[in-house]
């Protein structure tokens, strides 16, 4: 072994000191006895122990970590009071004079704030109230938003109290509330506070250029505070912001204390208040009184008893103006309430919706019966009567020539089409996109008040219902699926024979299918699967693109040009003379539903 330190030298002295000398010769048996179970019975404890709450430390640790993460997140958005006030605690702890010297610029305040807090609220955190709770803790509460709300409400309450004391009437009793400051009205009631008597003369002169009617009265409350009551009828409708800006400009006051609301125009008590106030010597009034005051204050034998609503008058009005839409009937008839007694009774009724539905249904029934009694010639003449005569028939002819459609064959097929001749009852316009097919057919449908069928509704049993109310119909942009449906179910309709149409909420009716226009991008006659339709349709090819100039079609197919076209070729189409219809030139005798004056036109 090489020279060096013996590894056993360090522990040799320990073994010599601590080792015990045994006289036993059998060392192996002694070691076995030492490690017997009886000897080490108390080394292992095999008894059952109570489990206890072993998860409590883990839960406590998780809760602590969660609170730290939330606090760290909030610190990104909420400044401490010292930081918001610009105090650096680290520098201030060393020396307050070092705070004036800085090599780096101050960090900008964060843009995002938690719960809408801003720098002002953070700065006012140090000055917030200390409110002691019932549990002995203290909570920091800022009273700035609450104070602003209370101050605003208190100012309005004080203004309303001043108005009531000065004029002996509540402002809310004279007015109705507009929630929006942008809602328009002709009439406005104003209550102005702290108005000096010297400005009344200038206000009297300046308001005449803006108002049709002016009435104002200046009174004083118990506290000697002045309050000016205004009733204004402007020459044009104005909103609350506009009236307030106008009064501020005329009075030369920037922060004007004013209450502005529209008056109650249907209250007899309010109308009497303004009528009586106008006769007081100290009240200034200019111009004629509004009609809502005069109508409710003039007592005569016609006003002693209000006339009841008559549905026949409303139906006659809608029939004369050709209104069949419920919303149009309700809105336009309500606008006549100022001049028509029956419309005024309609607005006073609680069954307006029922009256509108009944009126619309009756007008549709009358117009449907009127249309069915007319021939196609009478219907065309009826539709042309109310149109302008300044059209040019050459525009229609030039458009057909542009599409290279021969005019004479077109007129022959159009004559048979308008008569509803079997096998000639359907005209198909085929061509590429942007060739003017829909433009041509839609203009003709609009002229003759036809109906448009949409194949998208073909899964409904009622998609053919518009045919019952039309003299002409259109299927626009028919695809292959549409042609398959027509070939399967509508061959009779193309023939012009009677068909059964299912009506919603009514029993199916049998009608003769009106002439049908179809536009398509599918060449029907080139596909043999639709060979049974070849003899039932008249196809016109529109292969040229429709010319557009400055966003407007070169060939303008409007009602006036179509009217000129029909008037020019009336005899060519062999349409009957209106005088031969038996009405002395009129297309249909006038329908009178009640005795009285004529209906007001729109």
Swiss-Prot record:
Protein name (database record): Replication protein E1
Residue segments, region DNA-binding region: 138-306
Covalent cross-link Glycyl lysine isopeptide (Lys-Gly) (interchain with G-Cter in SUMO) as placed by the record, residue numbers: 512
Binding site for ATP: 431-438
Oligomer and partners: Can form hexamers. Interacts with E2 protein; this interaction increases E1 DNA binding specificity. Interacts with host DNA polymerase subunit POLA2. Interacts with host single stranded DNA-binding protein RPA1. Interacts with host TOP1; this interaction stimulates the enzymatic activity of TOP1.
Motif (Nuclear localization signal): 74-76
Organism: Cottontail rabbit papillomavirus (strain Kansas) (CRPV)
Cellular localization per UniProt: Host nucleus
Swiss-Prot/TrEMBL GO biological process terms: DNA replication
Keyword tRNA-binding set for record: no
GO cellular component: host cell nucleus
Known role: ATP-dependent DNA 3'-5' helicase required for initiation of viral DNA replication. It forms a complex with the viral E2 protein. The E1-E2 complex binds to the replication origin which contains binding sites for both proteins. During the initial step, a dimer of E1 interacts with a dimer of protein E2 leading to a complex that binds the viral origin of replication with high specificity. Then, a second dimer of E1 displaces the E2 dimer in an ATP-dependent manner to form the E1 tetramer.
GO molecular function annotation: ATP binding; ATP hydrolysis activity; DNA binding; DNA helicase activity
